[in-house]
């Protein structure tokens, strides 16, 4: 089984996340995409952010019964600072002989540029393949793959494009829209929208 790790705060998960994960499955050829929500200490949560419990619950609601999506909660359970090295080791040990080839690490273009500076990069980077999701194309930007190639010229490892449809939305935009009473409901799956409303999330 070919597995891809897709980490993030998912505060909240939105359609852009799901489109990228779907592209990793359909175009990059991975059998399952594991959404890995990062832990945020209750003492360090930003005002207006959702709790770890709410973020995990929204992820489960978002993926529903999609057979090639799963939620991996190891960073939430571990607590503290989330290090990719520990997550890669945990997933490799958890799936063991079921794994086919290397794990994939799904990244956005901006995050990919900073990867060589991540904690213990040399200890885990050779154990993963990198799949890069495009950010939205702007006027004069060129195509997604062409632009990403230029952006990641100095990236020290081979990578492939997820060939995803990149939507110009973000979790930050959604939180701000909720706080300011703007339209946001169609940027997230309907079960997530209903959960946010029922729980009164992001209003402060």
UniProtKB/Swiss-Prot annotation:
Pathway: Cofactor biosynthesis; NAD(+) biosynthesis; deamido-NAD(+) from nicotinate D-ribonucleotide: step 1/1. It comes from the Bacteria. Its EC number is 2.7.7.18. The gene is nadD. One of its GO terms (molecular function) is nicotinate-nucleotide adenylyltransferase activity. Gene3D superfamilies: HUPs (3.40.50.620). The keyword GTP-binding does not apply. PANTHER family: NICOTINATE-NUCLEOTIDE ADENYLYLTRANSFERASE-RELATED (PTHR39321), PHOSPHOPANTETHEINE ADENYLYLTRANSFERASE (PTHR39321:SF3). It comes from Treponema pallidum (strain Nichols). GO terms for biological process: NAD biosynthetic process. Pfam families: CTP_transf_like. It catalyses: nicotinate beta-D-ribonucleotide + ATP + H(+) = deamido-NAD(+) + diphosphate. NCBIfam families: cyt_tran_rel (TIGR00125), nicotinate (nicotinamide) nucleotide adenylyltransferase (TIGR00482). Keywords: ATP-binding, NAD, Nucleotide-binding, Nucleotidyltransferase, Pyridine nucleotide biosynthesis, Transferase. This is Probable nicotinate-nucleotide adenylyltransferase. It is an enzyme of class 2 (transferase). Catalyzes the reversible adenylation of nicotinate mononucleotide (NaMN) to nicotinic acid adenine dinucleotide (NaAD).
């Amino acid at each position: 089984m070919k597995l891809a790790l897709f980490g993030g705060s998912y505060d909240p998960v939105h359609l852009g996340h799901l489109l990228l994960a779907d592209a990793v499955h359909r175009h990059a050829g991975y059998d399952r995409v594991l959404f890995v929500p990062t832990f945020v200490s209750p003492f360090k949560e930003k005002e207006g952010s959702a709790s770890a419990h709410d973020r995990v619950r929204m992820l489960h609601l978002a993926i529903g019964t999609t057979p090639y999506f799963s939620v991996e909660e190891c960073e939430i359970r571990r607590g503290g600072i989330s290090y990719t090295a520990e997550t890669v080791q945990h997933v490799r040990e958890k799936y063991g002989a079921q794994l086919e080839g290397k794990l994939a690490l799904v990244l956005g273009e901006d995050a990919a540029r900073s990867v060589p500076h991540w904690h213990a990069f040399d200890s885990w980077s050779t154990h993963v393949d990198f799949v890069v999701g495009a950010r939205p194309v702007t006027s004069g930007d060129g195509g997604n793959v062409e632009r990403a190639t230029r952006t990641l010229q100095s990236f020290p490892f081979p990578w492939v494009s997820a060939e995803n449809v990149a939507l110009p939305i973000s979790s930050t935009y959604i939180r701000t829209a909720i706080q300011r009473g703007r339209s946001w409901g169609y940027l997230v799956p309907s079960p997530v929208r209903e959960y946010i409303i029922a729980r009164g999330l992001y209003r402060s």
